[in-house]
Amino acid sequence: MTAAFYDLMDFDEVLEKYDPVMGLEVHVELGTETKMFSASSAHFGAEPNSNVDPVSLGLPGALPVVNAKGVEWAIKIGLALNCSIAESSRFARKNYFYPDQPKNYQISQYDEPIAYDGYLDVVLEDGTEWRVEIERAHMEEDTGKLTHLGGTSGRIHGATASLVDCNRAGIPLIEVVTKPIEGAGARAPEIAKAYVSALRDLVKALGVSDGRLDQGSMRVDANLSLRPIGQEEFGTRTETKNINSLKSVEQAITFEMQRQAQVLDDGGVIDQETRHYQEADGSTSKGRPKETAEDYRYFNDPDLPPVIAPREWVEEIRATLPELPWVRRARIQEEWKLSDAEMRDLINANALDLIIETVEAGTTPDEARAWWVSYISQKANESGVELDALGVAPAHVARVVALVSEGKLTNKLARQAIDGVIAGEGDVDAVVAARGLEVVRDDGAIEKAVDEALAANPDIVEKYRAGNTKVTGAIVGAVMKATRGKADPAQVNQLIAKKLA
């Protein structure tokens, strides 16, 4: 069911009547070499069911062994989120039956997580900060992946067959769970988006995950309930599952606020259920009834001992924490002498890390900003993808800047080179060669084009010689057209001035 089939309350009216309460659960795949409880490769993109073993397939007699690097990185995430680290935590079995869960249970953590009681301060679009409190960050294994065939939505409903890929089963996950986010009002969607963005930046800075929402290495479950203004008790929540972009997080929260408000206003009740986010129109659709913790029949996994994290080890890990994103931003703002507004623009465009890497690759901050915040951001918006998923790397931008500086590309040709990179035609040099983009250096060819343009525009020549030197734009344009944009505008202007002197 699409948004057009739902009655939605106007957003401003929602806020007059109801107070939203959010809870966000973010699953972060760790970038370890092997899985959480076995030696199979955890690398993304392998042939289906090639990275499997008896443990991840749940074969009888297979025993799990904890990935020590996964535990270390879980502690690292917990510390960066200002959490307390448990000296002893336990793995538990979360029991449920689903085709992508070969063992019919998931190894997770329940009442003894490795990290708890933390917070993450996030910066909103107007520069204000909001503290999101963290309930817990716990270790678990990922499930397999289902591909549904024959339906129209790509989901199990209406499908004629489902394919199971167990490569992902057993990959290390950290699930970061917030405490209820109250009092957000109209800013609830924005806070949700800012929190996920900040968490993504954090895990990337720590080097524990690539944070790719589009590839599923970060997945967001957004819980939302409404309560009448002034009421203390929480309403019934829904959980929108597996949201895979920052924009979608914002849209899903907004839609659920409007949908739930209309249901309540019409005298209906909110079902405690999971919901699916629909990329096409930003709506959510009904999933399944939402289980409670009791339904999962958690119990300590008898095959795994407690995870012991001595204080000395935790402090050793703390000492390895890199410069965290908010510290880095403050340093960059001071070094680059950016105003608060300029810094917010970079953060809101999710471009800061890309710009920093571009500067490290050899450009100036202004050159890097000009490309990422304008042309490349425009291309990302047109494609409906996040900036870092467009296919343009900092090295590509640094290369086109260098070619422009060397006079081998004009800005227009440089944009065409970036277009080729986005289209998957190779790196910048390969695109320039394949498309024949390099600036024309044949003085004879350019001089011929200038002569022809002057001959075709005698009125402009007359005005120029009468003292109006600003009229040569049409001549330059004609030359650029004749050379298919490959002439150097500075060289063209010099030739025009020389011939009209």
Curated annotation (Swiss-Prot):
Keywords: ATP-binding, Ligase, Nucleotide-binding, Protein biosynthesis. It comes from the Bacteria. GO terms for biological process: glutaminyl-tRNAGln biosynthesis via transamidation; translation. Residues 288-299 have a biased composition (Basic and acidic residues). InterPro entries: Asn/Gln-tRNA_amidoTrfase_suB/E, Asn/Gln-tRNA_Trfase_suB/E_cat, Asn/Gln_amidotransferase, Asn/Gln_tRNA_amidoTrase-B-like, GatB, GatB_Yqey_C_2, Gln-tRNA_amidoTrfase_suB_CS, Gln_synth/guanido_kin_cat_dom. SUPFAM superfamilies: GatB/YqeY motif, Glutamine synthetase/guanido kinase. One of its GO terms (molecular function) is asparaginyl-tRNA synthase (glutamine-hydrolyzing) activity. Its EC number is 6.3.5.-. The keyword NAD does not apply. It is an enzyme of class 6 (ligase). Disulfide bonds: none annotated. Pfam families: GatB_N, GatB_Yqey. It catalyses: L-glutamyl-tRNA(Gln) + L-glutamine + ATP + H2O = L-glutaminyl-tRNA(Gln) + L-glutamate + ADP + phosphate + H(+); L-aspartyl-tRNA(Asn) + L-glutamine + ATP + H2O = L-asparaginyl-tRNA(Asn) + L-glutamate + ADP + phosphate + 2 H(+). Allows the formation of correctly charged Asn-tRNA(Asn) or Gln-tRNA(Gln) through the transamidation of misacylated Asp-tRNA(Asn) or Glu-tRNA(Gln) in organisms which lack either or both of asparaginyl-tRNA or glutaminyl-tRNA synthetases. The reaction takes place in the presence of glutamine and ATP through an activated phospho-Asp-tRNA(Asn) or phospho-Glu-tRNA(Gln). NCBIfam families: gatB, PRK05477.1-2, PRK05477.1-3, PRK05477.1-4. Heterotrimer of A, B and C subunits. PANTHER family: GLUTAMYL-TRNA GLN AMIDOTRANSFERASE SUBUNIT B MITOCHONDRIAL AND PROKARYOTIC PET112-RELATED, GLUTAMYL-TRNA(GLN) AMIDOTRANSFERASE SUBUNIT B, MITOCHONDRIAL. This is Aspartyl/glutamyl-tRNA(Asn/Gln) amidotransferase subunit B. It comes from Corynebacterium glutamicum (strain R). The lineage of its organism: Bacteria, Bacillati, Actinomycetota, Actinomycetes, Mycobacteriales. The gene is gatB.
